[in-house]
Amino acid sequence: MSDRRYDVVIVGSGPAGYTAALYAARANLKTLVFQGFELGGQLMLTSDVENYPGYRDGVMGPDMMDDFEAQAARFGAEMRSENVERVDLSERPFRLWSEEEDEPVFANSVIIATGAKAKWLGLEGEQRLMGKGVSGCATCDAFFYKGKKVAVVGGGDTAMEEASVLAKFADEVVLIHRREEFRASKIMLERARNNPKITFLTGTVIEDILGENTVEGVRVKDVHTGEEQTLEVDGFFAAIGHVPATSVFDGQVEMDDGGYVFQKEHTMTSVPGVFAAGDVSDTRYRQAVTAAGDGCMATIDAERWLEEQGEAEDAEDPAVWTAEKERDAANL
């Protein structure tokens, strides 16, 4: 196989991408990971991860992603900290171009694991206090707000769900929405309204997030009167949706209206030989552990597909690796 041709090329370096790489490399598939310039994905912005199995004392998001990368690299996965700027999935081998090189990389199969990002308001305080009280995931971080007061911005089902999750821990949740009416479904809205810990502040926009080293409050403005006030809160949660990082694959694979990659069969996309894993195709869970599981499944699907095409004859099943192979890999 030429130096520029791989059995599997994985685009993305979060839990899904690194897990896919681990399984691919351990199956003796020639594997390349385009990590992108944001190595590790959204977990690089997470201070404490306490809901991933195996880290009983919790772990910093960046440290966790370092572990993922090292484990995949240990078995021979090649890493490149480059963004993919163009792909051609119209014929095989597939071709992918990075921003660093004019010549393409060739792939017998591709796993899309580019993830999705929470939408933000674009406030200076959001980026400055990211992971220091600013979050886009209540399921991930609600535990840290026991007995505290938090603000949630949004008006759809996501906002109602985030507020409800936070209310299990926080003493008070203020749900802020710029309109008087909500896009949320009736049942989700009623559930939030009936929760005594959740208060609603409508017709209001957030002007700034306050605090030096951690969130201390938010400055809000009434859209009707222009009157401003400061709310003292310990945390701020954006719940205005997510944006999948799929623009480079636009027109290459089928996506839904939100830009999420459509999985036609298991993890395979509309293009045979191209698979999707993690938040890039997950509109519901968006958890590190589910993304990692997706990465595992995508590689298993890719390996089986390659075998069906007669292109993975030399690949070994991870389940039948010999002790000698394990010892060799441990010394890498």
Go through each PLM region and give its residues.
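Residue-level detector of alpha-helix initiation sites
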Residues: 14-15, 38, 116-118, 157-158, ...
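FAD-site-proximal beta/loop scaffold in flavoenzymes
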Residues: 5, 122, 128-144, 239-287, ...
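A conserved FAD-binding loop/helix module that cradles the flavin
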Residues: 160-162, 271, 280-328
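Beta1-alpha1 glycine-rich phosphate/pyrophosphate-binding loop at the start
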Residues: 6-75, 148, 160-186, 201, ...
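A Rossmann-like FAD-binding core segment of flavoenzymes
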Residues: 72-99, 105-107, 167-264, 304-332
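Predominantly flavin-linked oxidoreductase catalytic cores and closely associated redox partners
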Residues: 102-200, 209-211
